[in-house]
């Protein structure tokens, strides 16, 4: 997805990303420091749009993506600073969001336009 490509490009090039999406999902386990989707999703774009339209995805929270890592199985996780304070969970206010949750529950991202890959900037008319 363009959301993932832009976010990955930004992080790779030293930028951070503002994330706007759903923190009310049952699999957004902030106290445990994880956000993930429990079942595989075949078409994230279609399913994300459907969830936004039927309001099963809420636009209710913003956070700050500062890094991306891979687990021992090769799954991508974004390392994210939450705004709820350093003492709000056992990870000092951070959490790991797996790529599937990011693709399904992201509503918007905020990034410096220089961090957007050239092909996507062109598509956007920037």
Residue ranges of predicted features:
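Active-site signature of cysteine proteases
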Residues: 1-126
């Amino acid at each position: 997805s363009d959301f993932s490509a832009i976010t990955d490009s930004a992080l790779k090039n030293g930028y951070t990303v503002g994330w706007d999406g759903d923190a009310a999902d049952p699999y957004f386990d902030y106290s445990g420091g994880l956000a993930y989707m429990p079942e595989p999703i075949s078409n994230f774009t279609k399913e994300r749009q459907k969830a936004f339209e039927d309001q099963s995805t809420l636009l209710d929270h913003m956070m700050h993506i500062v890094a991306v890592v891979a687990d021992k199985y090769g799954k991508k996780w974004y390392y994210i600073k939450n705004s709820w304070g350093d003492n709000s969970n056992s990870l000092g206010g951070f959490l790991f969001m797996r790529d599937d949750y990011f693709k399904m529950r992201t509503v918007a991202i905020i990034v410096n336009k220089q961090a957007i890959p050239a092909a996507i900037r062109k598509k956007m008319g920037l």
